[in-house]
Amino acid sequence: MHNVIIFGEAGCGKSSLVNMIVDKPVAKTSNGSGGCTSKSQAYEATIDNATFRIHDTAGLNQSNQGRVPHSVAEQGLYKLIEQLDGVSLLIFCNRGMVKKNATANWKLLNKRICGKKVPILAVVTGLEEEDDPDDWWKREENRKVFRKYRLNPLAVGCIVSFLGKRNEHADVYAKSQAKVRRLIKVNHRQQPWNPAARPRSCFWKRLFNK
């Protein structure tokens, strides 16, 4: 089974993305910016006869007064990956315009914990006002921000993960769902990266070597 880890700031839509991938309302969602996931939760999804374990994680960049302080969320990600028998894909989830904090979050998972051994996707949420979600990535100013912060995903998925009060976004939601599931199937690592192959002390060194 392939492990897929979704990470990002609190309130960016990770849990809604999980529900979209799994095709069931398995993860609790919140309309607030503080996030609703306090610890990692795993859910199974089947994509074209392949089974994936999708990990919803606590939101990063919360203050000490937040549901999960940033330092605790960081350590939770480390402990999650350390206990897995392999990691096949990382998904950086972000709502709209990328902020400076994204650089640290990206570096945390991609470099400090996984040592650039795991492919990484970017999924941009909160695009309900776009005529076509893909238009967001076509704008040079958005691509420029990714380059500025040195975010280099294998692919970018611009989506709508909210059906709407009266299912007004149902059509674009369905297209977004198919898009994300396809990106996972195409870009995941066939031979999962095994964190156990790296000494435990090396993990801690990477985690705190900012």
Give the location of each predicted region:
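Conserved GTPase G-domain substructure that encodes guanine base recognition and part of the catalytic core
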Residues: 1-210
